[in-house]
Amino acid sequence: MTAPLGFAVIDKPAGLTSHACVARIRRLLGIRRVGHGGTLDPAVTGVLPIAVGQATRLLPYLPGDKTYRGVIQLGITTNTDDLEGEISSRQPLPALSSAELEQALAPFRGLIQQRPPQVSAVHVDGERAHARARRGEQMDLPERAITIHHLHLLNWCPEQGQLRVEVHCSAGTYIRSLARDLGQNLGCGGCLASLRRTQALGFQDAQAIPLPERPEPGATATDPPALPLLPPQDALAHLPQRRLSAREQEDWSCGRRITPGADQESDAVVVLSEGGRMLGLGVPDGTGGLQPKVVFEARG
């Protein structure tokens, strides 16, 4: 049986953790080497890229930006900064026009400092913040630099105090924190009502497929796999490519440097066979040559 290799783009359903989705894919394919590209909270739906087999080694090279569509609820604060948590306060809804709300959103665009939610995956003294928060601990989490490239107001419903937004942001951005901080700036409090991720690591909503059903007890993995996988190079369209001759491919599989070709101005280069099969990633050595960094089908 050929080892599966590639990316599955899952439309994560509400109610499941990202880890639970990975565990189901492991069971379905019968392999352990499976990882996801960016945690989604259980209540959040949408694009969850899952790397299968040696494609897990490519995750650090994928673009980290993500895009979300969500609803922010003004007038309510919770201990988790979303409506999944316990309500901490209720305040009268602000009388805002769409133009005034746009002004309130302006400070959150660009490079900003953001404090993660108390219930988050941030490490505090070697432990996840959410574990300490659920024990009732209050933590002074430091602010972190993040970038919100685009923040669009899609709809504003003043009667309900809900605004629908689209956010294109850097890795490490918390939309729950955005909702909390917007409400704080407006003086009424706020939290996240719902959220869907529409783009992650270069994968789009249109590519996402439903999470496969849980395999029956005793079921065995299939060949080919019962899960469609995108070729690994599809996730690396932002990187230059180099095709190797049969002789160069032999050197590559043994971990040897590839002799100079065209100059590559990039931190990494996708290496392909003559037929277009991905062989791994190389690092330019400054002379036009490539040093192997990630080698699929390595020998010796």
From Swiss-Prot:
Keyword Phosphoprotein: no
Active site, UniProt feature: 41 (nucleophile)
GO molecular function annotation: RNA binding; tRNA pseudouridine(55) synthase activity
Reactions this protein catalyses: uridine(55) in tRNA = pseudouridine(55) in tRNA
The enzyme's E.C. designation: 5.4.99.25
Any Pfam family hit: TruB_N
Transmembrane region(s): none
Family from the record: Belongs to the pseudouridine synthase TruB family. Type 1 subfamily.
Protein name as annotated: tRNA pseudouridine synthase B
Protein source organism: Synechococcus sp. (strain WH7803)
